Amino acid sequence: QDISVDRYNFLKVLREGNPPAKLYCVGDDWQSIYRFSGSDMALFNQFPEYFGATEINKIETTYRFGEPLVFLSSNFIQRNGAQIQKNIHSFSSEMRTELEFYAYDRRDYCNTIGQLVASIPSDKSIFLLGRYSFDDYYLSFMYQSIKEGNRFYYVIGGRKIEFLTVHKSKGLEADYVILLQCNKDTYGF
């Protein structure tokens, strides 16, 4: 999903130098980040037009989460007609990924986060995720922050909890994820 015109041209030259060469490509347009690293989704979504005869195998099973998140996320992504249509399902029909939404007054933002953390069993892992690296700004007024290398943590209710952007969290897992600034503001989700 991150293929650019430059990368395409490089692969094209390699293939022209060795005509029997085959490509084995893996990607997921649902995970693409618009124009990340110069990517051009046309190269991915119209792969056969650029690379020739193609066999496509869709991976439609997720091992990361269950319903209702499978349905909600798939429905959201497939609203974009340019996305490759897929029928995503969880590897286990018994696996559930519960979603909870909390309304809060801006003045109670940090207290609301503290209450959420306090309600999570201590043996469960937690991530604080923001869209932007500054989404943790208000937390720094109430909670101790710790920087270890390039990782940031907040001590909330005696627990050290990592803060990441959604982009940096790609591929990571936690038992509980708290999305910060999940609103309709200028910098919200």
Model feature map: region roles:
Residues 1-3, 29-30, 169, 182:
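Conserved Walker B
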Residues 5-96:
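Conserved RecA-like helicase ATPase core segment
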Residues 122-125, 169-189:
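Conserved helicase C-terminal RecA-like lobe
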Residues 32-35, 65-68, 135-138, 172-173, ...:
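Short catalytic/ligand-binding loop motif for oxyanion handling, primarily in non-cytosolic enzymes
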Residues 27, 130, 181:
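Short beta-strand/turn micro-motifs composed of small residues
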Residues 159-168, 176:
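Conserved two-lobed SF2 helicase motor
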Residues 23, 124-130, 161, 177:
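Generic beta-sheet signal
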Residues 53-55, 61-155, 169:
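Helicase P-loop NTPase motor core
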